[in-house]
Amino acid sequence: YAHIGHDSVTGNHCILVNNTALAGHVHVGDWAILSGFTLVHQYCHIGAHAFSGMGTAIGKDVPAFVTVFGSPAEARSMNFEGMRRRGFSDEVIHVLRRCYKIVYRQGLTVEDALKELAEPAAQHPEVELFRQSILSSARGITR
């Protein structure tokens, strides 16, 4: 059993594992995987290819490709295994790894990190998807 609240939208190929609960107005991007007992606060956006660990409580937006764990949720990595399984090239995975480090490991503000992502986003549509999922966040991103 999984609960999908009112006016919520799930993308294609999503997996919502047992006892996952989405509050109202949640948006889950394509290929996202929400592990068992994941809770998602109303109005949150879960980006495409994102992954949540078991028992995660998500209260802010999760950018595309990001892996979150914990209660409250914290970003831990990117969903590299999911990318490999879906045929992403080693080059794209390497570039996304660098972009994750820009946002989550360099101590930059979100605004400054987005500026740093502009160049690789112009060259790789996957990075642009990651960048746009941060740029469009209304609740703030899980960090």
Tell where the protein language model's regions lie, with residue ranges.
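Structural signal for interior beta-strand "rungs" in well-ordered beta-sheet cores
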Residues: 2-74
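Terminal amphipathic alpha-helical/low-complexity segments used for targeting or macromolecular assembly
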Residues: 71-143
